[in-house]
Amino acid sequence: MVKYNTKVLGFGDNVVDLYEHSHMMYPGGNCVNLCAYSKMFGVERAAYMGYFGSDDIAEFVISVLNELGIETVKCKQLVGENGWSKCTLRDGDRIFGDYNEGGVRGKTPYILDRFDLEYIKEFDFVHTGNYCYTESQLKVMKEAGIKISFDFSDDSSKEYYEKYAPYITYAFCSFDGDDEAAKEHLKFIHSLGPELVSLTRGSKGCIMYDGEQFYTQPATLIDNVVDTMGAGDSFLTSFMDCYIDQLKRGTDRQEAIRTSLKEASKFAAHVCTLNGAFGYGKPYED
């Protein structure tokens, strides 16, 4: 059921999360998570664009995307290993181990052509991130007038922000510091060009900055946390999906931000009750 008049495209990573403690594997990756959460959230259209490997775990991710009704018409399947990441859970918190740097995807540069760009323009925004190997295409998309949502990591360097944030419309990252340090970090990122900048801080909630004021959103606390995998992805997804819908309805921008932050907090809490990033687990053998 469509609840939000939003069209979203995830461009970049897909992986399989291998849970070593339970020998279950789950589909994941920042961009795949975005598409799955958007479907759960009730958007008009969700699509994934990226490279798959040619092995069994690639087929597993493809089958889940098909089951969810996520568009994959711009994907390519390359000969080689699909991306995977090993992890375990400790008291519901995810702990990452070994990973294969995206498999064949990490070795194959993206080059967007005019037809790709026309396709991307059909969506309200494209989402990608710093584990997606898409950085070389950010300028190309920006110059084509495409709005870009980008997930920086907590280990993104100052130089990385300075190089890529100027191409970004909506910037997201996680942050560990106190309120004052968080606000300074937000100001720094915003000064580089993005319209909106968001910091998520786990149980401390979120702080967002639009260049005029800060917005704070407490985390929605729940008792039955199962797995925090995808908590940040689900927050940014539901915020963006709701925010775009609110703007299309003519809602004042500041009110749209406040409404969307509340919705995002609730949705992210719900996602923490699921196994894996969004479920769809399958047993695997070493």
What are these regions (language model features)?
Residues K7, E44-A47, E71, I146-K147, ...:
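Residues at the starts of beta-strands that form the adenosine-phosphate
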Residues C31-M40:
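Histidine-anchored nucleotide/phosphate-binding helix
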Residues M1-H23:
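Positively charged, low-complexity intrinsically disordered leader regions
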Residues V16-H21, M25, E44-D124:
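Conserved N-terminal subdomain of the carbohydrate kinase-like
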Residues V2-T6, K183-D286:
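Conserved phosphate-binding/catalytic region of the ribokinase-like
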Residues V43-E44, E143-K147, L192-L196:
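A short helix->loop->beta-strand "cap" motif at the edges of active sites that frequently abuts
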